């Protein structure tokens, strides 16, 4: 279980660059950061992807919520864990509805 590295283990510091770059007196008006490339609109309009993922999230959230409600139907008083599980289930189900409805894509124009 040895190493196959057979070189010198001594490292030398690289030489500092000799070219000096002076800061211009008037900086450019545009930002130096390039604009982000436009996203593929096909990903936002993929109806089958949204239906599959949204309905899966909605189903998973419904399952988590109903599993948390099962002891309540038997008359067991809810504890903090049960309430938290119900809140998480509702949150996951709401996330699925948001994926299905896609309110951001419809309310804001895609550039």
Curated annotation (Swiss-Prot):
For this protein, the record's InterPro entries field holds: DMAC1-like_dom, DMAC_Protein
Q: Which residues form a coiled coil?
A: none
Q: What is its main location?
A: mitochondrion
- Which domain of life, per UniProt? Eukaryota
Q: Print the keywords alphabetically.
A: Membrane, Mitochondrion, Mitochondrion inner membrane, Transmembrane, Transmembrane helix
**Bilayer-spanning residue ranges:** 51-68, 81-101
From the UniProt entry, list the residue stretches annotated as the region Disordered: 1-40
Q: Where is the composition biased (Low complexity)?
A: 18-38
Compositional bias per record (Polar residues), positions renumbered to this chain: 1-11
Q: Which GO terms describe its biological process?
A: mitochondrial respiratory chain complex I assembly
Q: Where in the cell is it found?
A: Mitochondrion inner membrane
Entry membrane topology: Multi-pass membrane protein
- Gene Ontology CC terms, in alphabetical order: mitochondrial inner membrane
Question: Could you describe the subunit structure of this protein?
Answer: Interacts with incompletely assembled mitochondrial NADH:ubiquinone oxidoreductase complex (complex I).
* Record's function text: Required for the assembly of the mitochondrial NADH:ubiquinone oxidoreductase complex (complex I). Involved in the assembly of the distal region of complex I.
The protein depicted here goes by the name Distal membrane-arm assembly complex protein 1
Species of the source: Mus musculus
Q: What is the lineage of its organism?
A: Eukaryota, Metazoa, Chordata, Craniata, Vertebrata
Q: Which gene is annotated as encoding this protein in its UniProt record?
A: Dmac1
């Amino acid at each position: 279980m040895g190493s196959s590295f057979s070189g010198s283990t001594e490292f030398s510091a690289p030489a500092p660059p000799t070219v000096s770059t002076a800061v211009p007196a008037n900086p450019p008006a545009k930002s130096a950061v390039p604009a982000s490339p436009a996203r593929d609109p096909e990903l936002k309009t993929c109806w089958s992807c949204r239906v599959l993922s949204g309905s899966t999230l909605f189903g998973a959230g419904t399952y988590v919520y109903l599993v948390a409600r099962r002891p309540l139907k038997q008359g067991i008083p809810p504890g903090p864990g049960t309430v938290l599980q119900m809140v998480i289930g509702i949150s996951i189900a709401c996330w699925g509805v948001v994926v299905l409805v896609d309110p951001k894509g419809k309310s804001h124009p895609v550039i």
